[in-house]
Amino acid sequence: MSSYRGGSRGGGSNYMSNLPFGLGYGDVGKNHITEFPSIPLPINGPITNKERSLAVKYINFGKTVKDGPFYTGSMSLIIDQQENSKSGKRKPNIILDEDDTNDGIERYSDKYLKKRKIGISIDDHPYNLNLFPNELYNVMGINKKKLLAISKFNNADDVFTGTGLQDENIGLSMLAKLKELAEDVDDASTGDGAAKGSKTGEGEDDDLADDDFEEDEDEEDDDDYNAEKYFNNGDDDDYGDEEDPNEEAAF
């Protein structure tokens, strides 16, 4: 009996003995499953025109930023490039594809992908150098010789407005040159007129002589096509009027 009682007392420490009165093992299992209430998830409806336009604008904006000159790419790749560059020499920029990925594997299809560089230097940015002071050119890495060479080119407005110099001698010299050109043109025109006049006088005499010669030829040539000139009807012939018996017949 003692052993049974001890066994029963020892068995009272099991999981079922700790349950409240009126609850069973099945109730505990159900409560464990339904500990968090089930929430019905919403079902997305069809996309509207406004949502579609916003999505398209967002995608286009991202492409525009990536294709712009101020896009530096992924910052993690730039940091890795700076950490890996142990020497102070400048290494070539990393070239990425459209998805900003560079797995290091060269493929034949890579030549059809759009490439972009990260870590662009200051020379590649379209800065307006006129807005920066000259003291910052050395820090920005701008070559002064190159800048001076570019500044030598004239602007497009100079072609129409001139060089902007207010020198009267330049205007006078231009007027003098224009007058000389006008005089040369007048002299050339008068010389050409006199030469043409002399040539026309000689030409008129030649024309008159040619006309006289042509008239004589016409008079001589008028009877060339006169058939009556070469036709003889026999009226002027004396054959058959008188017969001379002493004359022999001519064959």
UniProtKB/Swiss-Prot annotation:
Q: Keyword check for Transferase, yes or no.
A: yes
| Residues carrying Phosphoserine | S189
Region annotation (Disordered) ranges: 186-251
Q: Name one GO molecular function term.
A: DNA binding
Q: What InterPro entries does its record include?
A: RNA_pol_III_Rpc31
Skewed-composition ranges (Acidic residues): 203-225, 234-251
| GO cellular component labels | nucleoplasm; nucleus; RNA polymerase III complex
Q: Sorted alphabetically, which keywords does the UniProt record give?
A: DNA-binding, DNA-directed RNA polymerase, Nucleotidyltransferase, Nucleus, Phosphoprotein, Transcription, Transferase
Name where it's found: Nucleus
Q: What's one GO BP annotation on this UniProt entry? A: tRNA transcription by RNA polymerase III
Statement: the UniProt record of this protein carries the keyword Ribosomal protein: no
Further information in the entry reads: The acidic domain is essential for its function.
What job does this protein perform?
Answer: DNA-dependent RNA polymerase catalyzes the transcription of DNA into RNA using the four ribonucleoside triphosphates as substrates. Specific peripheric component of RNA polymerase III which synthesizes small RNAs, such as 5S rRNA and tRNAs. C31 is involved in the formation of the initiation complex.
Give the quaternary structure: Component of the RNA polymerase III (Pol III) complex consisting of 17 subunits.
Q: Which family does it belong to?
A: Belongs to the eukaryotic RPC7 RNA polymerase subunit family.
* Name assigned to this protein: DNA-directed RNA polymerase III subunit RPC7
Give the source species: Saccharomyces cerevisiae (strain ATCC 204508 / S288c)
**Quick one: which gene encodes this?**
RPC31
